Amino acid sequence: MAYVTWLLAILHVHKALCEETLWDTTVRLSETMTLECVYPLTHNLTQVEWTKNTGTKTVSIAVYNPNHNMHIESNYLHRVHFLNSTVGFRNMSLSFYNASEADIGIYSCLFHAFPNGPWEKKIKVVWSDSFEIAAPSDSYLSAEPGQDVTLTCQLPRTWPVQQVIWEKVQPHQVDILASCNLSQETRYTSKYLRQTRSNCSQGSMKSILIIPNAMAADSGLYRCRSEAITGKNKSFVIRLIITDGGTNKHFILPIVGGLVSLLLVILIIIIFILYNRKRRRQVRIPLKEPRDKQSKVATNCRSPTSPIQSTDDEKEDIYVNYPTFSRRPKPRL
């Protein structure tokens, strides 16, 4: 009995640690990075605070209360500012001046609301290149504004899937839209401002993400990550394109670019063929000139007025004219 209690305690601690290390958004480190934090509900907000988890301790960055002035810690006083601290302070996104590697870590944006209670968003800042480069598209989907868009991801069949995560990938950040633990059939509540829906049922062979009433801002890359308990994972990336009244520049541009590249290759091949033909002709002309000169020399040696005699002329009789002398009788003596 004591062993079972001890095992349950370990599992509880492990679950708590996993929940603590989970973050809602991953942001690429840059000098002027912005950590987005917008409260999505309409409850009465009383206070908001920003903190950073260094791994060993939690450091306070700023605290804002509508009944008091904004308080920013001395270490961050001239390094951060709030983009929108208007009345209601629902958008408390934190922007940095000249951020450096020292700012890498996990940040917490905590809203205190009444009567709903605390609402927290965790943001992880990492050193990385553009996230879109690391997530090339596997499929394309086009839709019109106002439609309910359904993204589908086929799950692996060769190994058991424990968790499925849907993310929206942007160049500067990656947001978790939905997360489902298939073994426990538990869902993750997304802190992303855009509300989405997804399925979460054990034994399902595919995962879907529904984006209601799609708009132009929903265009972009969506990644479906399947993870096993052993750490094995697989990703599937879909590029969603919300058309603007029927024309889609984002979809047309790659096609036009491909056609232009194809025409350019064809033009280069044609120029190469024509160049080779011209070069061959230039090589043949000097070879013909000696033959022409020989024929001209042979022609000049012949008399222009003497025609070529035929074989019949060679067989004709030849007559010679001899002079005739008169025979006078010798005088008789």
From Swiss-Prot:
It comes from the Eukaryota. The modification Phosphoserine is found at residue 326. Residues 287-316 are annotated as: Disordered. Disruption phenotype: Deficient mice show a normal composition of lymphocyte populations in the spleen, bone marrow, and lymph nodes. However, they show increased tumor development and mortality after transplantation of Meth A cells. Moreover, Cd226-deletion mice survive significantly longer than did wild-type mice after the injection of various doses of LPS. Phosphorylated. Phosphorylation of Tyr-319 allows GRB2 binding and activation of subsequent signaling. The chain crosses the membrane at residues 255-275. The modification Phosphotyrosine is found at residue 319. Residues 276-333 are cytoplasmic. Residues 19-127, 136-237 form the Ig-like C2-type domain. GO terms for cellular component: external side of plasma membrane. Glycans are attached at residues 44, 84, 91, 98, 181, 199, 233. Residues 1-18 form the signal peptide. One of its GO terms (biological process) is positive regulation of type II interferon production. Interacts with PVR and NECTIN2. Competes with PVRIG for NECTIN2-binding. Interacts with ITGAL; this interaction mediates CD226 localization to lipid rafts. This is CD226 antigen. The gene is Cd226.
